[in-house]
Amino acid sequence: MPTATNVENGRITQVIGPVVDVEFPPGTLPDIYTALKVTNPGVDERQDNLVIEVAQHLGENTARCIAMDSTEGLVRGMPVKNTGAPISVPVGQEVLGRILNVVGEPVDERGPVAATKTLPIHRSAPLLTDLNVKVESFETGIKVIDLLAPYLRGGKIGLFGGAGVGKTVLLMELVNNVAKKRGGFSVFGGVGERTREGNDLYHEMIEAGVINKDDLSKSQCVLVYGQMNEPPGARARVALSALTVAEYFRDVENRDMLLFIDNIFRFTQAGSEVSALLGRIPSAVGYQPTLSTEMGELQERITSTQKGAITSVQAIYVPADDLTDPAPATAFAHLDATTVLNRKLTEIGIYPAVDPLDSTSRILDPNVVGKEHYAVARAVQETLQRYKDLQDIIAILGMDELSEDDKLTVARARKIQRFLSQPFTVAQQFTGNPGKYVELPDTIRGFKEIVDGKHDDLPEQAFYMVGGIEEAVEKAKKLTAG
C-alpha cells in the first residue's frame, strides 16, 4: 500500500468524540487508511497507546481520523506520530490461542504476542487468476448440515438464530472438526457483541480443548474482539483484522481456514456510525451510502484460492425480523448457504437445532453433490414437509385417523428428525455422550435406508443422539434387550 514519502508528525487540532482532526506540515499529509499514533494519558500510561486511522483529507494539511479506542484525555496541540503504514496485526502460529484487539494487541493478560510477522488489515481481494474455480463441498461431520445445507469450501454461510439455541456450541464443534479432520485453524471475529459473551466463549473453548492454555501452540483458534463497548472505529475494522489473520494461514501456510464472524450486522452498524461522524449524507434507513462497497470489500477477500480456503460462518442479526432491511439484505447477496437454528427443535431436545426445511445451500445441486446425495436430501425434506403438513390433523383427530401411507410417512419423519440430532465432542462433558464425526457417505447411506423403509421396525428413540446408522441399529438391539 502506498505511503506518504515524507513521513512527518502532526498535531491534533480538533476532537469530536471518536473523530480526531490532525494537522500536518505542508506536503506531508498521510494517505487514507494510514495508522497514526497518539499518547493518550486517559487510556493508560503507555506511549503511543491510541491508534487513529486517516479517513478523510480536509483541505491541504488536515486529516480527519477515526479513533480505535477512547479519545477521553486528548487535547488540542498534542503531537501525533505518523506510522507511514496502515493498521497491521500479528499473524502466524504465535497468535493461536490468543485474544487480540482490532490493532493486534493482546487483551488476554498473557503477555505480548511473540509473532515475527505482521500484515496490513486493508488488502486487496485475491486476483481472479489465483481463485480456485472448482466448486466443492466442505465436509463438517455434522449430519444435518452435510446432507441438507452443505457448506461450500471457501464459501460464506449465514447463521441465523436467537439467544440460547446453540450458535456457540455449533461454532465450537465446527472449530473442533476443522482442526481434527483437516488440520485447519479457525479465527473468531467478535464484532460488536457483548463482552460477557466473548469471555464465556474463551472459557468454553478452553474447557472444550479448542484452546490449550498450558501450551498455546496446540490451540486451534485465534480470537479477535472488538466488542459492544468499543468506539465505532474499532467495531468497523475488527472484522478486517480477523480476516487478515485467517488470510495469512490460507496464503502462506496453505491451510483450510474457518472464519467465524459474530455479528456481521454490527460491522454494518459500526460503518453507519463512522459514516455519520464523517458527515456523509445517509442513504436508505439511515445507513451509510457506501454500505455495499464496504460489505463487498470484506466478503470478496473470503474465498477459496489455489493455496487454501477461508470458509466463513457469519451470524446475522436481523433488526426487528425485517429481512428487507438494507444491512441483512446486503449480507444475503454474498451468502452461499444459510443455517437456521429453530427454538422449536431445542424444545423437543433435537441438537443441533438446525431447521432442515428452512436451511438452504446453493450447492445442493446434483451437478455438485452428486445425484444420490441430492435425491436423498430431497426425499428427507419431502418426508419432513409432509409430516409438518399432517401435524394439524394429528393434533385435532389423532394418529388413528391417518391413512396407512401417512402413518408410515409420520413414523419415518420422526425417525429422520431424531437421526438429524448428533452428539457433539465439545458438549460431551455436559451430556456424557462421546461426540461423533459422521463422514458424508455414511450420512447419505443412513438417511437413504430410513427413507427406503429399511428400518421401519426399529423404535424411533434408537435414532436419537447417535452418529451413523449402525449405531442406531445397535441402540435398538439394546433397547429391545433391556
Swiss-Prot record:
Family recorded in the similarity comment: Belongs to the ATPase alpha/beta chains family.
> EC?
7.1.2.2
Q: Which Gene3D superfamilies match?
A: 2.40.10.170, Bovine Mitochondrial F1-atpase, Atp Synthase Beta Chain, Chain D, domain 3 (1.10.1140.10), P-loop containing nucleotide triphosphate hydrolases (3.40.50.300)
Please state where this protein is localized: Cell inner membrane
Keyword flag Lyase: no
GO CC, any one term: plasma membrane
User: What's the protein's topology in the membrane?
Assistant: Peripheral membrane protein
Chain's role: Produces ATP from ADP in the presence of a proton gradient across the membrane. The catalytic sites are hosted primarily by the beta subunits.
Q: State the organism named in the record.
A: Anaeromyxobacter dehalogenans (strain 2CP-C)
Q: Which reaction does it catalyse?
A: ATP + H2O + 4 H(+)(in) = ADP + phosphate + 5 H(+)(out)
Arranged from A to Z, the UniProt key words for this protein are:
ATP synthesis, ATP-binding, Cell inner membrane, Cell membrane, CF(1), Hydrogen ion transport, Ion transport, Membrane, Nucleotide-binding, Translocase, Transport
Does the UniProt entry include the keyword Transport?
yes
Question: Where would you say this protein principally sits, based on its record?
Answer: membrane
- Protein name per Swiss-Prot or TrEMBL: ATP synthase subunit beta
